[in-house]
Amino acid sequence: QRREDITNMRFSDIYDDRLHVRQIKTGMMIAIPLSLSLPVAGLRLGTVVERCRLVSRGDYLISAGIRKNSPDGSIHPDGLTKKFVAARKFTGIQFSENPPTFHEIRSLAGRLYKETCGEEFAQRLLGHTSEKTTKMYLDEREKTYLLL
């Protein structure tokens, strides 16, 4: 999901064993099963939600904590991006001129789910209505030149 969707996810949006997401950009409504897993990454949505529950101080899955500038505990999407950049730097991994962005997590997840669950599933998970958009989105990060 997009960073705006992630920062808007709430525990109260979880019912019937699904995380219900209304995508902010498109308005697309998807209900993701908590049993959804991505074996290559060793992740299961329900486990991730439980980890969030352990540290969140409010209804938001990703919480800044209750503070003066965030009375409900929400975090701004830019704050999420800044924390991602800090975590990326903390790894000590040396990247090229263009290190991966937070948004590229979405693209990578789409490609991995395409491999494990098929392109139609990836398209629905991404919330795309157009197959063309999904195909473009699932294209590899590094483009290569066509040699003539």
Briefly describe each language-model feature range.
Residues 7, 111, 134-135:
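Key DNA-contacting residues within the recognition helix of helix-turn-helix
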Residues 23-27, 119, 126-148:
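Catalytic-site neighborhood detector that most strongly recognizes the C-terminal catalytic loop/helix
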Residues 4, 78, 132:
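Key DNA-contact positions within bacterial/archaeal DNA-binding proteins
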Residues 19-21:
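Short hydrophobic/aromatic-rich beta-strand segments that constitute the beta-sheet cores
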